[in-house]
Amino acid sequence: MRCPHCHKNGSRVVDSRPSEDGSFIRRRRECIHCGFRFTTFERYEETPLLVIKKDGTRQEFSRQKILNGIVRSAEKRPVSMERLTKIADKVEKQIRSIGESEVSSQIIGKFVMNELKGVDEIAYIRFASVYRQFKDVDAFMSELETMMKAEHKK
C-alpha cells in the first residue's frame, strides 16, 4: 500500500479490527520507508447482482429502489425511517443469501411484503397494490379478506 506521507509503496499491518457489524476491517499500517502510521478501511467486494424484471430485462440491483418503495408505501404511517431502513437491509440480506447472481423482481417483492406485513398492514396493502398490480377491486378485496382472516386467527 502506498504511504500517504512519503508516497512510496510498502507498509506493514500493525493492528486489524473488524467493525461492529462486520462489514469492514480497520487496519493500522506503518510505512516501512518513513515509519508514518495511517489507517485503512477494507470492505469486501460484493458480486454484482442483477434483477430480472417482469418483461425479462435485467437491471443492476439497487437497495435504494427497495427503500424508496418501502418509504412510499409507509408514507404518513407511524413507522420510523430507522425501521424502514432495517427492512431494506433485511430484504437485501435475504436476496444476497440466495447466492445467485440474478434474482427475479417477484422474489424481491415477496420478501418486502413479508417484512411489511409484520410492521404495518396499511403499508403492506399499499406495497402489495403496486407490486401485484391488482386488475380490479375484487382482486384487491380478496387480498384484504385473506389478510383479515389471518389477523382473526391470531
UniProtKB/Swiss-Prot annotation:
GO terms for molecular function: ATP binding; DNA binding; zinc ion binding. GO terms for biological process: negative regulation of DNA-templated transcription. Residues 49-139 form the ATP-cone domain. It comes from the Bacteria. Signal peptide: none annotated. Disulfide bonds: none annotated. Its cofactor is Zn(2+). The keyword DNA-binding applies. The keyword Flavoprotein does not apply. Binds 1 zinc ion. A zinc finger (unnamed) spans 3-34. Keywords: ATP-binding, DNA-binding, Metal-binding, Nucleotide-binding, Repressor, Transcription, Transcription regulation, Zinc, Zinc-finger. Belongs to the NrdR family. Negatively regulates transcription of bacterial ribonucleotide reductase nrd genes and operons by binding to NrdR-boxes. PANTHER family: TRANSCRIPTIONAL REPRESSOR NRDR (PTHR30455:SF2). This is Transcriptional repressor NrdR. It comes from Limosilactobacillus reuteri (strain DSM 20016) (Lactobacillus reuteri). The lineage of its organism: Bacteria, Bacillati, Bacillota, Bacilli, Lactobacillales.
